[in-house]
Regions:
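Aromatic- and carboxylate-enriched substrate-binding clefts and catalytic-loop regions
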Residues: 1-13
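Substrate-binding clefts and catalytic carboxylate motifs of secreted carbohydrate-active enzymes
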Residues: 14-146
C-alpha cells in the first residue's frame, strides 16, 4: 500500500538519524518501528547469572535472551551495543548501560510519536514493534517487563 509506513525499512546504520528520517517521511501510517532498550536490572537478574550480567557478551545468557543475534540483519540486535557506543562510548556498569539505553529509547519514541502527530490528519496511525516479546528478554522486552 503506497504511503504506508511498513517499509522500505530505514536504519540509522544507513547514515541518517531518526530525527531527520521521520521528519522527511510522509506516510498514512507507521506500522512497524522500534527502538529496542535493555530490560530493567530486576528483570535481567531473574535469568542472567550474576557472573554474566556485565559486560553483556555473545555466547552467554544475553544471547539466549535476544540481546545478540535476535535478527539476522544485525547480530547486535536487540542490545544494539554499537549504537549505544556511538553516542556515549563503552558503558562502565550495567546500570549505566541500562540508563543510556532507556534514554535513547525514550527520546527515539518521543521523536517518532511527536512527528506522527504533526502529520495528522494525513498520518492516522503510529504503532511501534518493540515491547511485544512473549517471554522475558534481555532487550526489546514486553511492556509488562515480566
Amino acid at each position: 500500500m503506497p504511503g504506508m509506513g511498513h517499509g522500505p525499512y530505514m536504519f540509522r546504520w544507513e547514515g541518517e538519524e531518526i530525527y531527520t528520517l521521520i521528519e522527511k517521511a510522509h506516510c498514512t501510517a507507521y506500522t512497524e518501528f522500534g527502538i529496542p532498550g535493555v530490560s530493567p536490572r530486576s528483570v535481567l537478574e531473574t535469568f542472567i547469572p550474576r557472573e554474566e550480567l556485565f559486560p553483556p557478551k555473545p555466547g552467554t545468557s544475553w544471547e539466549w535472551h535476544h540481546a545478540f543475534g535476535a535478527w539476522e540483519a544485525d547480530f547486535g540486535t536487540w542490545l544494539c551495543p554499537n549504537l549505544l557506543n556511538d553516542y556515549w562510548g563503552e558503558a562502565r556498569s550495567l546500570d549505566e548501560l541500562i540508563a543510556r539505553s532507556e534514554l535513547l529509547q525514550s527520546e527515539g519514541y518521543k521523536t517518532i510519536y511527536e512527528e506522527a502527530r504533526r502529520q495528522k490528519p494525513y498520518c492516522s496511525m503510529a504503532l511501534n514493534w518493540c515491547f511485544n516479546e512473549p517471554w522475558p528478554t534481555a532487550a526489546n522486552n514486553s511492556i509488562v517487563a515480566y
